[in-house]
Amino acid sequence: MENEVNLDKIMPKVHSALDKLLAKTDFDSLTVKSIAEEIGFSRQYFYRAFADKYALIVDLFEYDMQRGVEIFFTPRFCYLHTLQYILDSKRIYKSIFSSSYATYLYDVMYNYGMEFVRAMAEYMSVRSFTKEQDNRLRLYFLGVTSMLVKTIMGSEHFTKEELDRIFYDNIPSFVDFLKDETVTRDYILYKIMKYREAHIV
């Protein structure tokens, strides 16, 4: 094995191994030994690469996010594209959300999401935030995260085109959201619900 861990080389193997293992059992039942053996690693190499199952979740999600960031130019397109990676790995993420490790995944999603909305603000030349705007940023992303989690945990499958429509046609624009104090997380979730009723069979 190489001295340095190259996530670009090993993460596709991790994806494949987890998908196979989670077809038979749940995430909580997986051990470092079972994951390492399915990937073809020694336990020592697994611990060097990920430290533990929590670090594996963080690295897995950040790897999927980074793949989207590298492809598109605007933050909004980046985020939409990374949602598709999550949906493509639905079995893995659904199992994690159903496990005792769910809080860790919520945390890393939330942290990534805040970076996303701040990057989008900078892209749109919104250089600073009032306290009220910062609070609404958090509501905005919590609404988006709720949509993503409900999609993964539910039976619906959103295509890339459907995700585009949700963001562009049904959720308030980012700048309008910063200005409009009446826009809340409940309003965003209401718009998502109405979209589902109209478009998802």
Residue ranges and their predicted role:
Residues 69-96, 101-102:
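Hydrophobic alpha-helical connector segments
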Residues 23, 27, 31-36, 50, ...:
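Core of compact, soluble alpha-helical bundle domains
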Residues 93-96, 121-124, 151-155:
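Secondary-structure edge/capping motif, primarily at the C-terminal ends of alpha-helices
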Residues 102-149:
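Amphipathic alpha-helical packing segments from all-alpha helical-bundle domains
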Residues 40-50:
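Short hydrophobic/aromatic patch on the recognition helix
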Residues 1-25, 29, 34:
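Basic, helix-initiating cap at the start of DNA-binding domains
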Residues 12-20, 38, 55-81, 111:
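Alpha-helical structural segments
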Residues 153-201:
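C-terminal peripheral helix-coil segments that are non-catalytic and often amphipathic
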